[in-house]
């Protein structure tokens, strides 16, 4: 079977590296990270990938420049070998730069093609759709369609530990990517704007080598023809790879005491509370030792918010810039003035999206 992982723009290479580190051969094609194998490799990827958004089973690809062509493409796939006759079929679609741009119409045609194929197999007109779910995803770009099954259900960023809201949260998969890009694996880590704790917790999961999907379920576990044994084995494998780390190895701080308590609560849910030391302090009082500092400082779209954020960047310059001889620093922000306000040019800069906000990841290494 062929699968592919999706990732945020420009992070496909990071996702491919993660798969290779899991012992899975991967290649990047058309902004997707493809790999092949049996159910155990799908389970390993779902459980172990940190920066990917979703993982799919690739069903079929082909030309879809008309509704007839799309129907024939869908109908040609072996759906009766993939979807049970009681399976719930959900269709999602994305269309761009194509003749077929109506998402509802595309969804309708794809569902029609699948049902027609199942009708021919099972010789029945009505399907109850009251059993396991099959989430079919259709992407049409430049009149070419990719049809796949979403293996995850909830996106891979849903680790299960973050349940309390915080202002401008960083998605877990993005936080994991920031840590991977700067080369953090295990060692002292600092986050002076911890918010709800995402960067610190993702750092602790990585330091412990705890697979991020170890304690959640995936939609594909219930697919027809899939057994639970592969998932049991891969979860056992992941648990065996967990390592011990020094208590308080990671320091997470914030000027807002309520955010510090929220981060502590999330760390407890993630099972990494002992790895993180939480402090209530402003960034201007930061004083860390050797290690890595990765942070998502406040930023805003309104003038007042921007001015406040820029004052914070100057505080960072006072407290963090003198420590760069012993700290590797990574800062994600959409503000193109960051380097000037911080008072030093970055050694590397990478474009990254935080949700739909285009940011730069400034690295001082």
Language model feature labels by segment:
Residues 2, 6, 10, 247-249, ...:
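Conserved Class I SAM-dependent methyltransferase catalytic core
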Residues 147-183:
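SAM-dependent Rossmann-like transferase core, predominantly class I methyltransferases
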Residues 1-132:
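Non-catalytic nucleic-acid substrate-recognition regions in nucleic-acid-modifying enzymes
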Residues 136-152, 362:
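C-terminal edge-of-domain segments
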Residues 96-99, 155, 298-302:
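A short, flexible beta-alpha/helix-coil linker loop
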Residues 170-287, 302, 306-308:
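Conserved S-adenosyl-L-methionine
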Residues 290-296:
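Short SAM/SAH-binding signature in class I
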